[in-house]
């Protein structure tokens, strides 16, 4: 369908996009889309790595009913590999005591 577009139609589509979003917002939108794509790609790689790590043991083990203690260190979510400007700490639910 996209291959059937003529050059004039492509120019008209670009003009409509510029009119809708404005020339100032388009670079920011493209940058945001690129960051989102990098995050999605890194998360997909991490999931594949986790799946490979859990699938590697082929021996049967007995399930342990104990719950491991939660870590008290703060975790950080990083938007993209090497992108330290958008790193932020994870806000975890903490019990509140109100009198």
Curated annotation (Swiss-Prot):
GO terms for biological process: protein transport by the Tat complex. Residues 46-99 are annotated as: Disordered. GO terms for cellular component: TAT protein transport complex. Keywords: Cell membrane, Membrane, Protein transport, Translocation, Transmembrane, Transmembrane helix, Transport. The chain crosses the membrane at residues 1-21. Residues 84-99 have a biased composition (Polar residues). It is found in: Cell membrane. It comes from the Bacteria. Its main location: membrane. Residues 53-69 have a biased composition (Low complexity). Pfam families: TatA_B_E. InterPro entries: TatA/B/E, TatA/E. One of its GO terms (molecular function) is protein transmembrane transporter activity. It is a single-pass membrane protein. The Tat system comprises two distinct complexes: a TatABC complex, containing multiple copies of TatA, TatB and TatC subunits, and a separate TatA complex, containing only TatA subunits. Substrates initially bind to the TatABC complex, which probably triggers association of the separate TatA complex to form the active translocon. NCBIfam families: PRK00575.1, tatAE. Part of the twin-arginine translocation (Tat) system that transports large folded proteins containing a characteristic twin-arginine motif in their signal peptide across membranes. TatA could form the protein-conducting channel of the Tat system. Belongs to the TatA/E family. This is Sec-independent protein translocase protein TatA. It comes from Streptomyces griseus subsp. griseus (strain JCM 4626 / CBS 651.72 / NBRC 13350 / KCC S-0626 / ISP 5235). The lineage of its organism: Bacteria, Bacillati, Actinomycetota, Actinomycetes, Kitasatosporales.
């Amino acid at each position: 369908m996209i291959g059937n577009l003529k050059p004039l139609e492509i120019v008209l589509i670009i003009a409509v996009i510029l009119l809708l979003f404005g020339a100032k917002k388009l670079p920011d939108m493209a940058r945001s889309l690129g960051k989102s794509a990098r995050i999605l790609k890194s998360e997909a790689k991490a999931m594949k790595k986790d799946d490979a790590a859990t699938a590697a043991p082929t021996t049967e083990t007995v399930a342990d009913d104990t719950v491991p203690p939660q870590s008290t260190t703060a975790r950080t979510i990083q938007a993209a590999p090497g992108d330290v400007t958008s790193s932020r700490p994870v806000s975890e639910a903490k019990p509140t005591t109100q009198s």
